[in-house]
Amino acid sequence: MNGISLDQPGSGSLDRERGPVDAPRAEPRRLAVMTFAADKDYLALARMTAMHVAGLLGLPIGRVTDLRLAVDEACSLFLAGPSGPDAPLLASSRAAESATLTLRFDRLAEHLRISVSGPLPLRRPDEDDLGWTMLCALVGSPRWEVRDGVGTLTLTEPIPTGRA
């Protein structure tokens, strides 16, 4: 990956032999942002983006594949309908045609933070659900939060030392 910077223009310098040289920073570095229709037909774009970013960071192929699955599952949680008659409804109505999901990839000092945000799903993620269990197995401890009518699911993946 020598010579390629994932930073925004002007935030780092380029050394032809060592690749990007970044000034120390306290804030995360935004690697990619993708906003897409909240529709299952667009999940392939989210999966491919996750694979590409993880590959650029030098993660082993097994972790790249795990992150692809985790991003797919995280996005799918926003598309899921109620699981039964007792399912807690978080959003009484939403305009499905205009709903979008936003997928963000941020580089922290030693971690990749992936967040998916969008309109509140019809049901809160259930810790006993297969999807949530898969997320926990793939990325450890996903974090779910709701703020101002927007749900955000955050995944964190360690980055091997000496990479990107």
Located regions from the model:
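Short alpha-helix boundary/capping segments
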Residues: 38, 59-62, 126-130
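Conserved beta-strand-loop-beta-strand hairpin that lines the nucleotide-binding pocket
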Residues: 1-33, 77-164
